[in-house]
Amino acid sequence: MTSFVAQLDRLTNATTVEDVWSLHVAKMECFGFDRIMYGFTRYRSADSLGDPQDWMLLSTQTPEYMSVFFGEGLYRSAPMIKWAMANDGVCSWRIMSDPDWIASLSCEEKRVVDFNRSMQVTAGYTISFHSLSQRSKGAVSLVAAPDLTQDDIDSVWAEHGDTITVMNNVMHLKLMSLPHVNGRPLTRRQREVLQWVGDGKSVQDTAQLLGLTPATVEKHLRLARETLDVTTTAQGVLKAAFYNQMFLIDGSSVNAQPTQSKVRIS
């Protein structure tokens, strides 16, 4: 089994977000990418990426970087995020050294570029994943180690770019299949009542099936709606399904998350 196939085998057989992320981070470091930032939203609109609590955001960037980039809202003007939202595929960061391109940026975009330079985020690649939904979008930022130039990482990409792209695509697709909480964890009972409602059962039916009173079922549905930040139970069923928190096999973890910077995003 080649190292490429072995990595895909490990990724596709991983059972938690944490396992997938740690496997992927370790492999990308082998290619010279020592800082990685992955993001996915199902709530994109024309001028927004949706509520940050609804994103899947994984990063090995420093807390200092994350607190400014997300905490101070720089991501809203980040040129490569804008590129990723409008395109599919791969983009080298070589464009960021083009004087004409830099001259075309807004003041807010130039601030992001200057901040990235100050944090040694200057060489790398962005991969924007294809989506069939106009509201969904995922992308990954692969940042080269500080001692590598864009020429260095372009040489790596010339030799291994196809392999790196496929590994990132598989990582993305695997993450989409795993349960995750995004700061909105449901209790076991909340999942149970949502599952029965999702199966078309009424509150009375659900109460009988679970041996509860209708009032208790209503309470758990209300708490589930509050946790998921939705107005209706139908919305709650949809969002829980988006998070892959519905109909879990016993023993599946919905709480395992990669270690990442805790950032308050305004």
Regions found by a protein language model. Name each.
Residues M1-L8, V17, G138-T187, Q195:
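Juxtadomain coupling helices with adjacent low-complexity linkers
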Residues R225-S266:
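Basic, Lys/Arg-enriched C-terminal extension of HTH/homeodomain DNA-binding domains
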Residues N116-A145, Q150:
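Extended hydrophobic
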Residues H220-L223:
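Residues within the DNA-recognition helix of helix-turn-helix
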Residues V25-C30, D34-H130:
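Regulatory input/activation interfaces that engage signals or partners
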Residues P179-T216, I265-S266:
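Helix-turn-helix DNA-binding segment
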Residues R10-L23:
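Signal-transducing coiled-coil linker helices
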